[in-house]
A protein has these predicted regions:
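Partner-binding and oligomerization surfaces adjacent to conserved cores of proteins
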Residues: 1-146
Length: 146
C-alpha cells in the first residue's frame, strides 16, 4: 500500500489516465518478473530530475553547518529513491514515444491512477508513494522538505 504525504500531490480522480512507455526489453522484463522496473533517482539522465532546487540546497547547507551528517543524508538520499515514471494524459504522446522507446520498438501501457493504487503491494522494507511530479525552475523555486 502506498503512503500519503502532504507534499506529494496526487490527482483526485482515480480514473485519471496514465501511460507507461517501454522499450521491448523492459516490457519482456515486466512480463517475466511480474514487477515494474524502478529506476534509482541518482541514475536519471536529467541531472535536475529528483534533486533539490538551488534555493532548497542552500537552505540544507545552512542547516548542515552544525550537523555535517544532515547534508550527507540528503546527498545520499537519491541513491535510495527508486521511481517508476508514468505520463498523465488522455491520449498517447509522441514525445514520450521518442524518449522512452528505442529504434521505434516499444509499447505503451495505459492504466489509471486508481488501478495503480490498487496494484501496489505493501512493501515492508520501504515507504511507497504515488504522486504527480511538479516541474519547477530549479534556479529560483524552493522545494519544501522535512
Amino acid at each position: 500500500m502506498y503512503l500519503n504525504n502532504k507534499n506529494i500531490k496526487l490527482p483526485e480522480d482515480p480514473d485519471t489516465i496514465v501511460w507507461k512507455y517501454l522499450d521491448l526489453s523492459k516490457f519482456l522484463d515486466l512480463l517475466m518478473s511480474k514487477k515494474l522496473f524502478m529506476s534509482r533517482s541518482d541514475k536519471f539522465e536529467d541531472q535536475y530530475e529528483g534533486t533539490f532546487s538551488e534555493p532548497t540546497y542552500e537552505e540544507i547547507k545552512r542547516i548542515a553547518e552544525n550537523n555535517p551528517e544532515f547534508l550527507q543524508y540528503y546527498k545520499s538520499h537519491r541513491e535510495k529513491v527508486a521511481v517508476s515514471s508514468w505520463h498523465i494524459n488522455e491520449y498517447e504522446s509522441f514525445a514520450m514515444w521518442q524518449i522512452f522507446t528505442q529504434n521505434s520498438e516499444g509499447l505503451a501501457i495505459q492504466s489509471t491512477i486508481g488501478r495503480l493504487q490498487n496494484a501496489v503491494i505493501p512493501e515492508k522494507k520501504y515507504d511507497q508513494y504515488i504522486g504527480e511530479v511538479n516541474y519547477i525552475d530549479y534556479k529560483k523555486e524552493h522545494i519544501p522538505f522535512e
